[in-house]
Amino acid sequence: MTMLKDPSSKYRAFPTINLPDRTWPSKTITSAPIWCSSDLRDGNQSLIEPMDAVKKLRFWKTLVAVGVKEIEASFPAASQTDFDFVRTLIEGGHIPDDTTIQVLTQAREDLIARTFESLRGAKKAIVHLYNATSPSFRRIVFNQDKAGVKEIAVNAAKLFVKYAAQQPETQWQFEYSPETFSATELEFAKEVCDAVVEVWNATPSNKVILNLPATVEVATPNIYADQIEWFCRNINRRDSVLISLHTHNDRGTGVAATELGLMAGADRVEGCLFGNGERTGNVDLVTVALNLYTQGVNPELDFSDIDGVRKVVEECNQIAVHPRHPYVGDLVHTAFSGSHQDAIRKGFAQQKADGLWEVPYLPIDPADIGRSYEAVIRVNSQSGKGGIAYLLEQEYGISLPRRMQIEFSQVVQRETDRLGLEMTAQQIHALLHSEYLQANTPYALVSHRLQEENGHSAVEVEVSSKGQGETNLSWRGKGNGALEALVAGLPVPVEIMDYNEHAIGAGTNAKAAAYIELRVNGERAVHGVGIDENITTASFKALFSALNRSLSEQQAKAA
């Protein structure tokens, strides 16, 4: 079977919402929503191998540490394992006073009774009721009309009131989800929710949560936002309900749908860390939270150690986080492209510690979420001078002059092409050494003596010549400064084009780095590098580095 030439013969476009006066497009999100993690329930039920009690407790503690205040822990009536985990949390004192446990149940009395029993002794709890309301579920799955579906929800809501009254020591909050809300007629979803809220007698001081799931993502995010805005406008007792979002990622836009839903008036978000969940997953709470953070809004969740959180999630879920996953993937703060690296390097150079973050290509400062800058720039065959220069400067304190960056980047590119792999900072540093600092043929500096004579510098150098066998030579020269004097004593014509120097490190362990660009015998300009404790020695080493590289190049050209 192949894809259809005319998919409209099999698939229908989701209808748009008649909301010409929609206001959400002009809104911005200015505060964090209430966060509810469904990792231990929705996320866990989607795993090939569900978590055991040890992993669940580890995950629970991670969610608490991050700052999630409402955590859906299980479906207690589904299994003894789920029931026991709720009891472990309550009896083991694992629920902080500022955190609320949430559990889920279907609309059957035996399941509801078992669910409330699991929560006995809890200080406060959210009990979450759901039943599917969309036309396809009514027709295909349940064979119920609208009245029947509404009756199921209302009867279950009454049972919630009954069983909650039997445990008055617990502070209860009720939640209702018209499952498949985004595929349900809006008027009918409102009708069912109004009826449930009426049974629960919601008030501003005892709010009911109305969770509006995109159980399966069936439309573009703007349509979901229209549905949420319409619902917020039309639901009864709006001041007594919290509108909660529960999006999935079937079309790849779960985060966008959630953000637009918040703009449309929602108060709360249910989802999973890094987007685990059925099929393509629930909305990723981390991405939504850090999207807020990078817009200057405190998400009230702490991902200062995002890699530590990822480690727990990966080990508990036994699913690796994709290397391109927003904010947390191994490669999301990494630039291989030369132009990107150059922009990032310049951004870091100009970034003020207490200023607005404006580093190109990095929407968040990696340090804010516990990431180092070491992996921001990595070098492969697509990289340019900026990335190479950045790595040498950050890791080794070596600041290459601009024109030398261009020359050395070509050296690095030849090596990455040869290897077919990326190069680490250590490998790049080693290549710099072999190409420049170890360029000692045909002349290697052995020693030098510098003195002032009548306002001029006089230099005498001893070099080891590796031309026709190894011999030591002595050259003398005078000039206005040490380098000019050395050039005057060389046996070949040399023109210095550029010279730079800087310190590496500080204090007694500091060294001097010297960079020289020169032209030998009128040929093309080449660069040399010298590093030494003494700045004069470093500059002489740099000159011999460039001289040798040029002469070797000329010899190869003539061969």
Curated annotation (Swiss-Prot):
Cofactor: Mg(2+)
SUPFAM superfamilies tied to this protein: 2-isopropylmalate synthase LeuA, allosteric (dimerisation) domain, Aldolase, post-HMGL domain-like
A single Gene Ontology CC term: cytoplasm
Superkingdom field: Bacteria
Keyword line: Amino-acid biosynthesis, Branched-chain amino acid biosynthesis, Cytoplasm, Leucine biosynthesis, Magnesium, Metal-binding, Transferase
Pfam families: HMGL-like, IPMS_D2, LeuA_dimer
Enzyme Commission number, as recorded: 2.3.3.13
Catalytic reaction list: 3-methyl-2-oxobutanoate + acetyl-CoA + H2O = (2S)-2-isopropylmalate + CoA + H(+)
Chief place of localization: cytoplasm
Location of region: Regulatory domain: 439-559
SMART domains attached to this UniProt entry: LeuA_dimer
NCBIfam families (UniProt xref): leuA_yeast (TIGR00970), PRK03739.1 (NF002991)
Quaternary structure (record): Homodimer.
Family: Belongs to the alpha-IPM synthase/homocitrate synthase family. LeuA type 2 subfamily.
Entry protein name: 2-isopropylmalate synthase
Organism classification: Bacteria, Pseudomonadati, Pseudomonadota, Gammaproteobacteria, Pseudomonadales
